[in-house]
């Protein structure tokens, strides 16, 4: 089997205008970026409001392992398969971040025969959306320090500036810094730090905004600091929102690309699900629902993170509700959850699979708590055995009364996921609730919301909130932010805050180290355990294998 980049490069892509035509998008509504990428202008997006919505399919997964699950690959394969069986489908994905692309995870354009293309462009600079978001965030950071430098009319307390800087790269050395050194001309020295761009509240606002007006209003609500009187200072107070919206104006138009099979895909926005809310833009999702009979989207990492935030944050704010949920699992990953080391995954081990099944079981049970119909997609790997697949399907049937379907879309494209597509259509057309069941009520205390997620979805005995975090939660409540949902930032590898505690642990304690207010996005970020909002690179980063060949073509991307 050729590599992902070789498959993508060998494909014959249609002009992006031809892809747009299948959705009824006229040429004048497109802003092309070359021959195979285009943005859809704001006016056409607004015109879609009059159209009826199709059915929304959410793709999520078990707790990820180094063995890989293939959630994006499955999302693409399912979208292709739905189109193959006659359901006009739009795929809605997040944009990849450069940090993981050059780090350990690699890109995020799918894999094998189920990819969105042009793969190199999507995984690298794409249409510059992340650069625009980084620039808007950086403008806000500059305006804060400039305001303090020129007299500080708002009375900002430099010790209580919450707005960190961002860059779209994994760089642990920037997590904690001291700024404004070198003399009085450089401002007032203070502690600061960088997050990765996908953790920026500007990214979250970008992905939750309905339109440009909503974007500007949300930017204005962002709290960046406290005054000496402990009052919130917002970007509206700093008169930053107009210029920031100008920087984001073009970026807010969703990006249209295609799959290897010519299915339309909207790729827009890209918050991580372990340190942010993990969903693509509301604008792209809503557009996909009005352009197709089905819109297939994903939420990052496992259902405990991405799917919970999709429901409790994105659906709560927008009124969206999935008609069906797909949980992606692999035999390999479940064997790892059952205690098998990665190097030993090639051998048949039904006993380990049965032990690791507890992880899948909890994710299925959690999705059912939302009141949503669910199916399991078993992403096939070449080393899997028939006995392992039969055992997994039997476990799903006997213990959970849920259908598990073997999918071969990585090797076969959409044809390998047609059984999954038919199962999804059956679930979606069988009737789903107009509104999902949220995990906690809006009026609950912030601490109670955190505890409810930990105990209900993670299997925890309780939470342990550090004193600094408890004081900030109390202040948020006092300032009127108590009705906001919470956005859990924790390791993606475990239901606990310990990445080594795999499977389905129970009785653990979720340690809450810090909290951050995202008033513009409309949630409170809860930082648990040792999770970092600025990742680091691994010992051998993926960047070491990326290069240009003698013909100027990119090699090594995956």
Swiss-Prot record:
Provide this UniProt record's keywords sorted from A to Z: ATP-binding, Ligase, Nucleotide-binding, One-carbon metabolism
Q: Name one GO molecular function term.
A: formate-tetrahydrofolate ligase activity
Supply the InterPro entries for this chain: Formate_THF_ligase, Formate_THF_ligase_CS, P-loop_NTPase
Q: Which reaction does it catalyse?
A: (6S)-5,6,7,8-tetrahydrofolate + formate + ATP = (6R)-10-formyltetrahydrofolate + ADP + phosphate
Q: One Pfam family of this protein, by short name? A: FTHFS
In short, the EC number is 6.3.4.3
Q: What class of enzyme is it?
A: ligase
One biological-process term from Gene Ontology?
tetrahydrofolate interconversion
- Binding of ATP: at which residues? 65-72
Which parts of the chain are coiled coil?
A: none
- Record pathway: One-carbon metabolism; tetrahydrofolate interconversion
Per its UniProt entry, which superkingdom is the organism in?
Bacteria
Q: Which HAMAP family match?
A: FTHFS (MF_01543)
Entry similarity comment: Belongs to the formate--tetrahydrofolate ligase family.
Protein known as:
Formate--tetrahydrofolate ligase
Q: Which gene underlies this protein?
A: fhs
């Amino acid at each position: 089997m050729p590599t992902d980049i070789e498959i993508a490069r060998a494909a014959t892509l249609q002009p992006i205008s031809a892809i747009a035509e299948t959705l009824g998008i006229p040429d004048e509504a497109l802003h092309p970026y070359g021959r195979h990428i285009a943005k859809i202008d704001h006016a056409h997006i607004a015109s879609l409001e009059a159209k009826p919505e199709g059915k929304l399919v959410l793709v999520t997964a078990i707790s990820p392992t180094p063995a890989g699950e293939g959630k994006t690959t499955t999302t693409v394969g399912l979208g292709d398969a739905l189109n193959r069986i006659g359901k006009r489908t739009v795929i809605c994905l997040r944009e990849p971040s450069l940090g993981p692309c050059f780090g350990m995870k690699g890109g995020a354009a799918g894999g094998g025969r189920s990819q969105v293309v042009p793969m190199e462009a999507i995984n690298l600079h794409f249409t510059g959306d992340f650069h625009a978001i980084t620039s808007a965030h950086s403008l806000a950071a500059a305006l804060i320090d400039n305001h303090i430098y020129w007299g500080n009319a708002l009375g900002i307390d430099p010790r209580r500036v919450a707005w960190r800087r961002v860059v779209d790269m994994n760089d642990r050395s920037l997590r904690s810094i001291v700024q404004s050194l070198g003399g009085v001309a450089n401002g007032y020295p203070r502690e600061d730090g960088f997050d990765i761009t996908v953790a920026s509240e500007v990214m979250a606002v970008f992905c939750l905004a309905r339109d440009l007006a909503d974007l500007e209003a949300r930017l204005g609500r962002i709290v960046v600091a406290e005054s000496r009187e402990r009052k919130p200072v917002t970007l509206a107070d700093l008169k930053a929102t107009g210029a920031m919206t100008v920087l984001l104006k073009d970026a807010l138009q969703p990006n249209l690309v295609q799959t290897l099979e010519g299915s339309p895909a909207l790729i827009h926005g890209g918050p991580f699900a372990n340190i942010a809310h993990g969903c693509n833009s509301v604008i792209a999702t809503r557009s996909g629902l009005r352009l197709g009979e089905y819109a297939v989207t994903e939420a990052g990492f496992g259902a405990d993170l991405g799917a919970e935030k999709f429901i409790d944050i994105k659906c709560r704010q927008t009124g969206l509700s999935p008609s069906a949920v797909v949980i992606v699992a692999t035999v390999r990953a479940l064997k790892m959850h059952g205690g098998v080391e990665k190097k030993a995954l090639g051998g048949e081990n039904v006993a380990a699979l049965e032990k690791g099944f507890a992880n899948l079981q909890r994710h299925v049970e959690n999705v059912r708590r939302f009141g949503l119909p669910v199916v399991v997609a078993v992403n096939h790997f070449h080393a899997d055995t028939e006995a392992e697949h039969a055992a997994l399907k039997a476990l799903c049937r006997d213990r959970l009364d849920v259908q598990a379907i073997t999918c071969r879309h990585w090797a076969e494209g959409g044809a390998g996921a047609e059984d999954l597509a038919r199962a999804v259509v059956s679930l979606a057309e069988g009737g789903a609730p107009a509104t999902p069941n949220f995990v906690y009520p809006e009026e609950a205390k912030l601490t109670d919301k955190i505890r409810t997620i930990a105990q209900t979805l993670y299997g925890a005995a309780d939470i342990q909130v550090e004193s600094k975090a408890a004081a900030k939660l109390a202040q948020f409540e006092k300032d009127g932010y108590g009705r906001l949902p919470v956005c859990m930032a924790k390791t993606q590898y475990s239901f606990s805050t310990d990445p080594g505690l795999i499977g389905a642990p129970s009785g653990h304690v979720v340690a809450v180290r810090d909290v951050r207010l995202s008033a513009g996005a409309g949630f409170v970020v809860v930082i648990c355990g040792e999770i970092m909002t600025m990742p680091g690179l691994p010992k051998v980063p993926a960047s070491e294998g990326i290069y240009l060949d003698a013909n100027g073509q990119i090699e090594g991307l995956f």
